[in-house]
């Protein structure tokens, strides 16, 4: 397949799920997966791409189960935010070990652990080819890390949100349950809403749509997929106007 000589994106927001870091363990952080992701991000930096990263926290804490057991939702969400900071610390460390300059910012103040999130500072760091990891979600309860990814993507003026998942893209049905499910190469925002396709939660998705922020869903477990996406190759599902 013919590839572009240059990346098709200048600045991206990479959304990683916490589950992507846990590997086969089902919990926690798999060091080998973390290091592989750091190497893939390093490749993008070497291509001259400015990279912002938002990581979920589901590998360390899931508030939904405890909420059902009676825990206050705000408390659960605050715990989830701290889980994303823990993942961010691990990712920053992996990037530093890969000789990539990275800065960790948090939407909630954690002095001595990481920097407070600042929109202007984040953009300045990106322009200086630093990877910026944006943790603690939006800093508010009731908002998912997908919402944080879209919000931060809009704020840092990213060209696209790249949503890394465990499947190759957006399918007509759940490929794990329906072997006849086929993958979409491209969709409009309205097609996703009309067909009720599960891309991300509605608040996050409508935020991206309202600000015309493209979303590309791809499989981060597939080696080289991230690079193929930024080089404009056929990879994953693109959602745009």
Swiss-Prot record:
Pathway: Pyrimidine metabolism; CTP biosynthesis via de novo pathway; UDP from UMP (UMPK route): step 1/1. One of its GO terms (cellular component) is cytosol. Its EC number is 2.7.4.22. GO terms for molecular function: ATP binding; UMP kinase activity. UMP binds at residues 57, 77, 138-145. It catalyses: UMP + ATP = UDP + ADP. It is found in: Cytoplasm. CDD domains: AAK_UMPK-PyrH-Ec. InterPro entries: AceGlu_kinase-like_sf, Asp/Glu/Uridylate_kinase, Uridylate_kinase, Uridylate_kinase_bac. ATP binds at residues 15-18, 58, 62, 165, 171, 174. Gene3D superfamilies: Acetylglutamate kinase-like. It holds the Pfam family AA_kinase. Allosterically activated by GTP. Inhibited by UTP. It is an enzyme of class 2 (transferase). Homohexamer. Catalyzes the reversible phosphorylation of UMP to UDP. NCBIfam families: pyrH_bact. This is Uridylate kinase. It comes from Enterobacter sp. (strain 638). The gene is pyrH.
């Amino acid at each position: 397949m013919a590839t572009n000589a240059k990346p098709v994106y200048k600045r991206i927001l990479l959304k990683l799920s916490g589950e992507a870091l846990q590997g086969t363990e089902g919990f926690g952080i798999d060091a080998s997966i973390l290091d592989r992701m750091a190497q893939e991000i390093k490749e993008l930096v070497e291509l001259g791409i400015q990279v912002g990263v938002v990581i979920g926290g589901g590998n360390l804490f899931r508030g939904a189960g405890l909420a059902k057991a009676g825990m206050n939702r705000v408390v659960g969400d605050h715990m989830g935010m701290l889980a994303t900071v823990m993942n961010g610390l691990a990712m920053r460390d992996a990037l530093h070990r890969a000789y990539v300059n990275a800065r960790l910012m948090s939407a909630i103040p954690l002095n001595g652990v990481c920097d407070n999130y600042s929109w202007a500072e984040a953009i300045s760091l990106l322009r200086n080819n630093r990877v910026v990891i944006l943790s603690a979600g939006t800093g508010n309860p009731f908002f998912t890390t997908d919402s944080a990814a879209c919000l931060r993507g809009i704020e840092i003026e990213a060209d696209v949100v790249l949503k890394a998942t465990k499947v190759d893209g957006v399918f007509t049905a759940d490929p794990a349950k329906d072997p006849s499910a086929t993958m979409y190469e491209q969709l409009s925002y309205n097609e996703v809403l009309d067909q009720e396709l599960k891309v991300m939660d509605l608040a996050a998705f409508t935020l991206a749509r309202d600000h015309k922020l493209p979303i590309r869903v791809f499989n981060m477990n597939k080696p080289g997929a991230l690079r193929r996406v930024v080089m404009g190759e056929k990879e994953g599902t693109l959602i745009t106007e």
